[in-house]
């Protein structure tokens, strides 16, 4: 027997594309500063990443041609294999998720056993994000849930774009779970 009435819920898989390569430096800098990283360290890393020159190295040798950024045409991103990329992405995505929650993108659930309310927004692992959607009323229609999912995904996509990121459409999907009383 069900203790609480079942509610329609949804989970959106909204995975990012090229997460380390698309990190914009200004929001990443602000996110790292919020974690206590000194601005001088951030400035050094960002300057190096923006102006670094790269070449291809294989078992056949090193490419004579280089590519990269300059002061006039800087690169973005944190660099694949960089020790700075994972903590930078962690800081950036935690700030983005905080903005998402403050804007109302979250599921509010009350435990029937503890009578405590939990605000859950997502489950994240690196660039793989599952957004949780929960309509406030147990009598909400499937259309209301679908509208909430669309609004939440659009909100998350807008926040991600502000950090330099993109949603990778091929890796995005939605699972709707609805109940019907008989």
Per-segment meaning from a language model:
Residues 1-3, 140-164:
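Inter-domain linker/hinge segments that demarcate the starts of reverse transcriptase
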Residues 32, 40-41:
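Carboxylate/His-rich catalytic cores and anion/metal-binding grooves
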